[in-house]
């Protein structure tokens, strides 16, 4: 398999270099991946690269977004709370439904890992994905929560790697550390949620 990574760091609206540091930390921890870092891309630029990666059956792909997130009124009626989650991009908002639909349409890659360290980053609802096989979703907080930052990194990204050892994520410890920031990380693997488990094995 060919290991490919796409990491998006949106530095505007006061986030600064912390989100770039988050992206680079993932790249540093995954040296076996050939990674691309996109700083403040347009929605089209980001999605074009993502589609090119997930459409190839030989690829193992990790897609990470480090950005602002927000909620807007749900127009399609598919959200229980009446709100859609969005990634704030340079040229506008990317709604969760559009991103999920795009992944469902083009995904042919062997394995896909989605990482989001953004506010309201329950943006990836595993129930909305058609194919759960070899799909891992790791997000920094639940839909109604915000993601906090330390000076140089996002709280979630830094604590994620502090709690990840030898292929195993200590979910209990990660939750404990982020509880102080009022963040509830969301972890789903192959269609099963591990939010309240002690630990989970993650394949990168």
Task: Name what the model sees in each region.
Residues 1-204:
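Cysteine endopeptidase catalytic domains of the caspase/legumain-like
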